From Swiss-Prot:
Involved in the biosynthesis of 2-methyl-3-n-amyl-pyrrole (MAP), one of the terminal products involved in the biosynthesis of the red antibiotic prodigiosin (Pig). Catalyzes the transfer of 2-methyl-3-n-amyl-pyrrole (MAP) to 4-methoxy-2,2'-bipyrrole-5-carbaldehyde (MBC) to yield prodigiosin. This is Prodigiosin synthesizing transferase PigC. PANTHER family: PHOSPHOENOLPYRUVATE SYNTHASE-RELATED (PTHR43615), PPDK_N DOMAIN-CONTAINING PROTEIN (PTHR43615:SF1). It comes from the Bacteria. Pathway: Antibiotic biosynthesis; prodigiosin biosynthesis. It comes from Serratia sp. (strain ATCC 39006). It holds the Pfam family PPDK_N. It is an enzyme of class 6 (ligase). The lineage of its organism: Bacteria, Pseudomonadati, Pseudomonadota, Gammaproteobacteria, Enterobacterales. GO terms for biological process: antibiotic biosynthetic process. Its EC number is 6.4.-.-. The keyword ATP-binding applies. Keywords: Antibiotic biosynthesis, ATP-binding, Ligase, Nucleotide-binding. InterPro entries: ATP_grasp_subdomain_1, PEP-util_enz_mobile_dom, PEP_Utilizing_Enz, Phosphohistidine_dom_sf, PPDK_AMP/ATP-bd. Disruption phenotype: Cells lacking this gene show a white phenotype and produce 4-hydroxy-2,2'-bipyrrole-5-carbaldehyde (HBC), 4- methoxy-2,2'-bipyrrole-5-carbaldehyde (MBC), 4-hydroxy-2,2'-bipyrrole-5-methanol (HBM) and 2-methyl-3-n-amyl-pyrrole (MAP).
Length: 890
């Protein structure tokens, strides 16, 4: 008796693996065990084989031309009998219902090998014709290059089944692991969940809650309830889109205790069926839990062994004794980085950093291995290695002075000794001093010219790059373009480095002079340090204000801004008759100048303002509603600075006054040069990103990788592919992408490593979120003087939450960078978890004349939006009155 070509997945044990494929067989097992699985049919592997024999000549199947086979499959007519069977199955699932069409290769999601993601999956498919097209696309995906590679490696049959399954229009969804993805512990179940559809969890687009439960008892061991500003759901056209979460649900748990118990019970049952650890996709609709997919875990979880910041170090003394810090490493690498961001930092470390720092006056730049370090997705500076090299230079000969400025209170230097040695001595030191002196003279003579050259380079290269048609360039031409970017990236970093180091040195000298000569000037030393440079980040804000002024002058254009959300304006403004001229004129001019800016710019996976201008448009909407007179604010800050400075200088000795004024002038000049040259190398990093996206666009058409894989691509593997030294299947192998994706997931689940560390680190699961309402005050670093009482606004995702910010609120964030500056113009004060005297939040707050306290470590965990804060920027304290207390008192 012939097996039907389309069968219902009903739990019937007569349905075999070679009929249903791995995914279909997995679902059938779950249904047989009585587990809740949405209704599904399977277009069997035999249906594929019958189709392929009829429509694709045998010669094409054997000559290895994958593209020809794919095209034949996609453009052939499905035999009428099979078309009827597929149509009947679709209607049986519900009249014109929305379904998922998933490939189910013979070894996919099987016990021997997990092929999850090798073949195609289509969600929210509606209509018989659309279903038929997607079935053919799944068949064709068997012949995608990345799938073909794995098919040959596993020696599986060239056949594929297709699953037609009802879509669960989820209230909440996510992923569940029957072993801890960080520690590898098998006695825990770890659940990541979000509001809405689960696509946001898998792609990393949305913030998730995390729950850890005891597998045997179901007891809740830990939970991380995060602010969830957005969620995935279908729009009115049936497309999956990112929407804003209703305010009332943003901080609520996305799962109830009863739903958690359902999930952990199902996890135990599914594990018994498979006799192995699983990761399970699930959804909740109307309080019922559905299992969507169960996969054997093929990437072994890492046990929580100690790790070292320098993965290349072989010397035990250096491994145990080197001091690493991420204090003052620059906002381009602050915070958790994706695997792409980390691999780009390693590219920078190996090829750029050494030659760049040589321009600071280092005769010996040592070896790239001692420059930087990495722990759990965070980037560190090797302070021991840097101090060792800087001993060549007279101003930094005292290495502990340099070393301790990067330390936190937890670091004990009592027994510390630089593991790399004492540095140059004797005649070698004399030669290095002479080299340093010559380089300083050269830098001083060329400084003004260097700044002009870097500004011109940025403008010229931006204009040239925007004129390129990347889609028309061959891979070899793209490689040549990348090599050009390499040259200018190095040149611009080398130009920036002397200004960067001299700014630090002058700031430290200024701070010491203030401490010596301003004994009782509580907080005033911070104020006289303000207004010492023409910050480019402030130029950005002034540029946005200028755009707003243009919009204000055009009534119809202003109405468009007022009537539409920022994400709607992104698609509307370029095509609308009212706004097209503005978009192509003033707004384009702004993007030419500032469009390469963004967040964490060394993480190439994060869009820049030109890639996604929705944040800029949101700020413009805010400024239209709440006008900002930034020039007035800056004048007031400058006037106050002058008054304070005059009062302080009048009480000083002539020598002290001369020294302080000289340092202020020198620091201001150097900081201005630093800020003027920085955008050039930032722009070069955007060029890298653009070419990566173009390459991924081409690989998507070949079925190898897509833009969704960008965060998990290894930058140097990408470069090797474009250079022609390795094939795409190797550079973008699914195994590599999956490994990087899993590692990033581990990092998200791990407790954030310390800001500074000596020796090994033991990864830890995140501690329960602090929500102790008894904590009434926090103390950190006094960063910008002044006092203010105002409501808090906690923002952890700038791109999504910017529109929530209201004028005269205190901005509370993990850290800030240049992309946050426009919000400072509206803020009453600034509070951050991470920061130092030269971090973005401190410098810009002082420029804008608003109080700031940084390095509070847990402010974003303890403070909630709506809490009333008393912010003292002179003493570094924040007093909290929680919203619940105010409501009770009221």
């Amino acid at each position: 008796m012939n097996q039907p070509l389309v069968v219902e997945i009903s739990g019937d044990k007569a349905l075999e693996h070679h009929h249903l494929g791995g995914k279909g067989y997995s679902l059938n097992n779950l249904i047989h065990a009585g587990l809740p699985v949405p209704s599904a049919f399977c277009v069997t592997a035999q249906a594929y084989q019958q189709f392929i024999e009829e429509v694709v000549p045998g010669a094409e199947l054997t000559d290895g031309d994958l593209i020809a086979v794919r095209d034949a499959i996609l453009h052939a007519d499905i035999p009428d009998s099979l078309k009827q069977a597929i149509g009947d199955a679709y209607q049986h699932l519900g009249h014109d219902t929305t379904i998922a069409v998933r490939s189910s290769a013979l070894d996919e999601d099987g016990q021997r090998q997990s092929f999850a993601g090798q073949y195609e999956t289509y969600l929210h498919v509606k209509g018989s014709e659309a279903v038929l097209h997607k079935v053919q696309a799944c068949w064709a995906s068997l012949w995608a290059e990345r799938a073909a590679q794995y098919r040959h490696e596993s020696a599986s049959h060239s056949a594929i089944a297709v699953i037609l399954q009802v879509m669960v229009d989820a209230d909440a969804a996510g992923v569940m692991f029957t072993q801890d993805p960080l520690s590898g512990s098998t006695d825990k179940v770890v659940i990541d969940s979000c509001w809405g559809l689960g696509e946001g969890v898998v792609s990393g687009q949305v913030t998730t809650d995390s729950f850890t439960l005891d597998k045997a008892t179901g007891e809740l061991c830990d939970q991380q309830i995060r602010h969830k500003p957005n969620y995935c759901q279908r729009d009115e056209h049936g497309l999956v889109t990112l929407l804003q979460t209703p305010e009332a649900k943003r901080d609520l748990p996305s799962l109830t205790p009863a739903q958690l118990q359902q999930l952990v019970t199902l996890a135990r049952q599914a594990q018994l069926i498979y006799s192995t650890e699983l990761d399970i996709e699930w959804a909740v609709k109307d309080d019922k839990v559905w299992l969507l997919q169960a996969r054997p875990v093929t990437t072994s979880a890492k046990t929580a062994n100690v790790i070292y910041a320098n993965p290349w170090e072989s010397d035990p003394a250096a491994k145990e004794g080197a001091f690493f810090s991420r204090m003052d490493t620059g906002e381009i690498v602050t915070g958790l980085m994706t695997p792409l961001g980390l691999s780009f930092c390693q590219f920078y470390q190996k090829h750029i950093h050494g030659p760049a720092i040589k321009t600071m006056g280092l005769a010996d730049i040592s070896h790239w291995q001692i420059y930087m370090g990495y722990i759990q997705g965070y980037v560190y500076l090797n302070i021991s290695g840097s101090a060792y090299m800087l001993r060549q230079c007279p101003p930094t000969r005292n290495e502990m002075k340099f070393t301790t400025r990067y330390a936190t209170d937890e670091i004990d230097f009592k027994d510390y000794k630089n593991p790399y040695g004492a540095g140059v001595q004797g005649w070698d030191y004399a030669k290095s001093c002479w080299y340093w002196l010559k380089q300083q003279v050269r830098n001083m003579r060329s400084a003004a010219r260097t700044v002009e050259q870097m500004i011109a380079l940025r403008q010229d290269e931006t204009t040239r790059f925007l004129g390129l048609d990347l889609t028309a360039m061959t891979l070899q031409q793209l490689d040549q373009e990348l090599q050009r970017i390499d040259r200018f990236f190095l040149d611009s970093c080398a130009a920036y480095m002397p200004f960067f180091l001299q700014s630090f040195a002058l700031y430290d000298a200024l701070a010491q002079a203030c401490e010596r000569h301003i004994k009782d000037g509580k907080g005033l030393q911070n104020r006289i340090k303000a207004s010492m440079n023409n910050l480019r980040t402030i130029e950005v804000t002034l540029g946005i204000i200028k755009l707003v002024a243009t919009v204000n002058q055009q009534t119809e254009l202003k109405a468009l801004f007022e009537q539409h959300r920022a994400d709607e304006l992104v698609t509307l403004l370029p095509v609308h008759d009212i706004s097209r001229a503005f978009w192509q004129g003033d707004f384009e001019d702004f993007l030419v100048e500032f469009g390469s800016r963004g967040r964490q710019e060394f993480d190439l996976s994060i869009p820049r303002w030109r890639d996604d201008p929705s944040y800029l448009l949101q700020v413009m909407k805010m400024y239209l509603q709440h006008p900002v007179d930034l020039h007035k604010k800056l004048r007031e800050t400058e006037l106050l600075r002058q008054q304070d400075s005059e009062a302080l200088f009048s009480a000083m000795s002539w020598s002290g006054r001369f020294k302080l004024k000289t340092l202020i002038k020198l620091y201001g000049m150097m900081a201005e040069r630093r800020e003027a040259t920085r955008p050039t190398f930032i722009t070069e990093t955007w060029f890298y990103r653009c070419i990566m996206l173009e390459v991924l666009r081409r690989l998507d058409a070949q079925g190898i990788a897509s833009s969704a894989d960008l965060p998990y691509v290894d930058f140097e593997q990408f470069r090797a592919y474009v250079a022609g030294t390795i094939p795409a299947e190797q550079a973008f192998s699914k195994a590599r992408l999956d490994q990087n994706r899993h590692q990033h997931l581990f990092n998200l689940h791990a407790e954030e490593p310390p800001m500074a560390i000596v020796g090994p680190y033991t990864p830890k699961v995140k501690a329960p979120t602090q929500d102790d309402k008894t904590i009434r005050s926090l103390t950190g670093l006094a960063a910008s003087p002044g006092n203010v009482v105002a409501k808090a606004r906690v923002i952890t995702d700038l791109q999504v939450q910017a529109g929530e910010f209201q004028p005269d609120e205190i901005l509370v964030a993990r850290f800030t960078d240049a992309s946050w500056t426009p919000l400072f113009a509206l803020a009453a004060g600034i509070v951050t978890d991470i920061g130092s005297t030269l971090s973005h939040s401190c410098i810009v707050a002082r420029e804008f004349g608003i109080p700031a306290v940084v390095n509070l470590k847990t402010a974003t965990q303890i403070i909630n939006s709506g809490d009333m804060l008393i912010l003292d920027g002179d003493s570094g304290t924040v007093i909290i009155q929680h919203q619940e207390e105010r409501n009770h008192d009221g």
